[in-house]
Swiss-Prot record:
Quaternary structure and partners: Part of the 50S ribosomal subunit. Forms a bridge to the 30S subunit in the 70S ribosome.
PANTHER family associated with the record: LARGE RIBOSOMAL SUBUNIT PROTEIN UL2, RIBOSOMAL PROTEIN L2
Annotated region described as Disordered, given as residue ranges: 201-238
Protein species of origin: Saccharolobus solfataricus (strain ATCC 35092 / DSM 1617 / JCM 11322 / P2)
Polar residues bias locations: 206-216
Role summary: One of the primary rRNA binding proteins. Required for association of the 30S and 50S subunits to form the 70S ribosome, for tRNA binding and peptide bond formation. It has been suggested to have peptidyltransferase activity; this is somewhat controversial. Makes several contacts with the 16S rRNA in the 70S ribosome.
Family per similarity comment: Belongs to the universal ribosomal protein uL2 family.
Name of the protein in its database record: Large ribosomal subunit protein uL2
Pfam family, one: Ribosomal_L2
UniProt-listed SUPFAM superfamilies: Nucleic acid-binding proteins (SSF50249), Translation proteins SH3-like domain (SSF50104)
Amino acid sequence: MGKNLLQQRAGKGSPTFRNPGWLRIGKVRYPNIFGHFIGKVIDIVHNPGMNAPVALVKLENGTKFLMQAIQGLVVNQKIEFGKGSPIANGNVIEIGDAPEGTIVCNVEENFGDGGKYARSAGSYAVVVGKSGDRVLIRLPSDKIKAVSNKARATVGIVAGGGVIEKPLLKAGANYWKYKVKAKKWPIVRGVAMNVVDHPHGGGLHQSVSRPSTVSRNAPPGRKVGHIAARRTGRKEGK
C-alpha cells in the first residue's frame, strides 16, 4: 500500500504544517481613523516571517499601530498621519495629495484596507498620474495600478532591501527561512521518489513514463501532476 502524499499530510492539519501565526507581533496595517494626527516612532522591531523591519507608532490620540519601517526612519522620530500631511519621508499621506514622481510604499487600494501594494523589504511604488478620483501608481513589477485618491500610503522606501544581498551559504539557513513562513522546503520531485511514495516514483529513471494529466475528480492519492489540463507541453506554432 502506498504512502500518503505531501498534500495529504498537510491537509490533515497537524502542527507541522500549521501557520505559526501566534509568532507574529500583530497586524501591520493602518488604523481606520479619519483626520490629521502627529505620531511618534516608539520602537523598530522584527516581526517573525517578515524581512522588513516594523515600526511601532503612537499617535497623539493614543492610537498605536504597526507599519513598515522606512529607510532612514529612527526611534523617537515624529511623523504625520492622515490628510494634509506634508510629503516627507515616513509620513502617511492620502495618495491623492502626492505629486507625480513621489515614491511611496504600503499603498492602499481603497481607504481602510490597511495597505496592499509595495509592502515587502526594499520595495516602493511611484505615482505616475491622476485620472478623476483615481491615482495611477507604478508597482515594483512595472505594472500600472489605479487606486483611490483617498487611499493612504507611506512616503519612502521600505527598509531591509539588502536582505537578498547576503548569501545563505548553507542549506540550514534556507531551511529556517522557510520554516518561519510555514512553507515546505526542500521540495522533492515525485520522479525522484520511490514507487511507494508517489505515483511518479520508481523505475530507476527520472521520468514520469506515463501520462501526467489527471482527472479533476481523481482521489487524493492519485491527484498529482497536470490536474485537469487542457493540454501539456510546448504550444506548436500554426
